[in-house]
């Protein structure tokens, strides 16, 4: 599902809310989440999961085109850990 598909589905469910307002709400929610992670803070949505940053240590990589080894710097990467309810739901029979 893409962001635009999510906006469309939510706008269909909440017909009393203009589609543009749904779009603005989704974009603002994602922006707030990005800013929170950028500050190094954790986001927890009970029943859904949590977002945090994990540190990837510096390592030696390889350029796939040339085969040459390359030093890669350490960096923080976003990490999502699903909550118990979400894990249980995805293990139920999949909806077609």
Curated annotation (Swiss-Prot):
Q: Which Pfam families match?
A: Bac_DNA_binding (PF00216)
The record's Gene Ontology biological-process terms are: DNA recombination; regulation of DNA-templated transcription; regulation of translation
* Record keyword Signal present: no
Instruction: Drop me one GO molecular function for this one.
Output: structural constituent of chromatin
Query: Which positions are tagged coiled coil?
Result: none
Q: Does the keyword Transcription regulation apply?
A: yes
Q: Where is the composition biased (Basic and acidic residues)?
A: 72-86
InterPro entries in the record, alphabetically?
Answer: Hist_DNA-bd, Histone-like_DNA-bd_CS, IHF-like_DNA-bd_dom_sf, IHF_beta
Q: Which is one Gene Ontology cellular component term of this protein?
A: chromosome
Would you tell me the protein name for this molecule? Integration host factor subunit beta
Its source organism is: Pseudoalteromonas atlantica (strain T6c / ATCC BAA-1087)
Gene name of this polypeptide: ihfB
């Amino acid at each position: 599902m893409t962001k635009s598909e999510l906006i469309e589905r939510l706008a269909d469910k909440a017909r009393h809310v203009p589609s543009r307002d749904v779009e603005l709400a989704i974009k603002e929610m994602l922006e707030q989440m990005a800013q929170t992670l950028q500050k190094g803070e954790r986001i927890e949505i009970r029943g859904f999961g949590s977002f945090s940053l994990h540190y990837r240590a510096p390592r030696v990589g390889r350029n796939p085109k040339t085969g040459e080894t390359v030093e890669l710097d350490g960096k923080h990467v976003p990490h999502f850990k699903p909550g118990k309810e979400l894990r249980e739901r995805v293990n139920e029979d999949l909806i077609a």
